[in-house]
Amino acid sequence: MNGSLSQHDQERLSTPYRDGPPEETVYLVTGASRGIGRGLIEAFLQRPKSTVVAWLRNVRTATPALSALTVAEGSRMIIVQLNSDSETDAQAAVQTLREEHGVTHLDVVVANAAMATNFGPASTMPLEHLQAHMMVNMYAPVLLFQATRLMLQQSKQQAKFVLIGAPISTITNMHDYSRAPLTAYGVSKLAANYMVRKFHFENKWLTAFIIDPGHVQTDMGDQGARLMGRPQAPTTVADSVAGICARIDEATKETTSGHFVIHTDGSQLPW
């Protein structure tokens, strides 16, 4: 979904706390080497007194570009390896945060890493493609929450677990995306939505929700656009990231948790 941000959202992007944060805010983003993930790392680093944890697959190749990002006063970035197709990397990465970097809590965790590589009809989709998508798009966010849950509970702010979702995963609106040959991607994101909503109900202390980032000009987004006969996706990474940050900042347990919200204005998508 494309759309421009309100002036209010743009003003809030770099100043989420008008009176200053109560303490250092710790953000964690997966899939941080490019696209939306990299954009979120850049945005969070511009906030004072922030620790921004970038979890990504290839630390060696991604570090030079990430290290060149502007860092606000009192802020820092930590880069940790995480393979989303691993069942053990999330726990190991949390241990690295604690033991090597002295991180004792997390305030915001963004499950952004995803894959979309199979583009055929559901009727002939090979099972191995579905399994691969379920591992990265559903199992990995579950493993991420399980690994970070205790550190989120240590937050002195309102702990937030955020899944970057996709409107193609909604059952109600499936007719709008019926031509898209993205069955494995859609059903794996749908399963992830269920789990995040389940986290909301099971954890009264947690704000857990899904954000539709728009159809974004990333490698994955542009590839999807071409499959639909369009030259590129309509939403820039900058606009998507600004909206995502605004929705995270304003999210509360009462108004946002357990819902699937649109990045531009926070309105809810149907399941």
Swiss-Prot record:
Pathway of action? Mycotoxin biosynthesis; aflatoxin biosynthesis
> Where does the source fall among the domains of life?
Eukaryota
Subcellular location(s): the record lists: Cytoplasm, Cytosol; Vacuole
Q: Does the keyword Endoplasmic reticulum apply?
A: no
Cellular component annotations (GO), alphabetically ordered? cytosol; vacuolar lumen
Q: Which Pfam family, giving just one, matches this sequence?
A: adh_short
Q: Which residues form the signal peptide?
A: none
Annotated GO molecular function terms are: norsolorinic acid ketoreductase activity; oxidoreductase activity, acting on the CH-OH group of donors, NAD or NADP as acceptor
Q: What class of enzyme is it?
A: oxidoreductase
Instruction: Give all cystine bridges in this chain.
Output: none
User: Which residues are listed for NADP(+) binding in this entry?
Assistant: I36, N112, Y185, K189, V216, T218
EC assignment: the record states 1.1.1.349
Hey, which family's this protein in?
Answer: Belongs to the short-chain dehydrogenases/reductases (SDR) family.
Q: Which PANTHER family match?
A: NADB-LER2 (PTHR43544:SF7), SHORT-CHAIN DEHYDROGENASE/REDUCTASE (PTHR43544)
List the protein's name: Norsolorinic acid ketoreductase
